[in-house]
A protein has these predicted regions:
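N-terminal signal-anchor transmembrane alpha helix
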Residues: 6-43, 49
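Extracytosolic (periplasmic/ER-lumenal) interhelical loops and adjacent juxtamembrane/interface segments
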Residues: 39-70
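Individual transmembrane alpha-helix segments
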Residues: 63-83
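Juxtamembrane "helix-exit" motif on the non-cytosolic side of transmembrane helices
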Residues: 120-128
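Non-cytosolic membrane-interface motifs at loop->transmembrane helix junctions
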Residues: 128-140
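Hydrophobic cores of alpha-helical transmembrane segments in multi-pass inner/ER membrane proteins
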Residues: 141-153
Length: 158
């Protein structure tokens, strides 16, 4: 018997590009929503970069400074895009044989589930993410799911 992933005809290249595109567009959506509704840019962006960077660099990086920090931003970006690609590859397994409309619907659901996993599941290990639980982050996760699903479907048809 062959392993499950060998039986699912996932286009891994399309999933890679879908993860990168979704990571970029979801981040842009989050920044636009912060700008429109919170008035706390760039500080909130620097906060989230430190929250992500602390996964690798440790919680000692968390004392919040409202300043750009190259090491934190580089590590946060690496984590963000690594997870974006992994999540996109997982999503691809659920939509590989679906049409575009169904894929987008699954992407929306995936975004909601991803928000729960990231903001409630991972906070058991990384409790500092609790402060990032808000509607803007939820919307960004849903945008991620929509973009990852639609981009994967379009690219996988080529």
């Amino acid at each position: 018997m062959t392993p499950l992933l060998k039986r699912i005809p996932i286009n891994w290249t399309a999933a890679l590009y879908a993860g990168i595109a979704a990571g970029i567009i979801a981040t842009m959506a989050q920044i636009i929503l912060w700008w429109a509704f919170s008035g706390s840019l760039p500080g909130i962006m620097f906060r989230d970069a430190r929250l992500a960077a602390a996964i690798i660099l440790g919680p000692e990086i968390l004392p919040m400074q409202v300043a750009f920090d190259w090491p934190a931003m580089i590590v946060a970006t690496m984590i963000h895009f690594s997870l974006s690609v992994i999540y996109s590859m997982i999503l691809a397994a659920f939509i590989v044989r679906r049409d575009l409309a169904v894929s987008i619907f699954v992407g929306i659901e995936f975004g909601f589930i991803l928000f729960g996993v990231n903001m409630y599941g991972f906070t058991m290990i990384f409790p500092w993410f609790e402060e990032a639980r808000d509607w803007v982050t939820l919307v960004a996760h849903v945008v991620f799911g929509i973009v990852a699903a639609s981009t994967y479907r379009v690219l996988s048809l080529r």
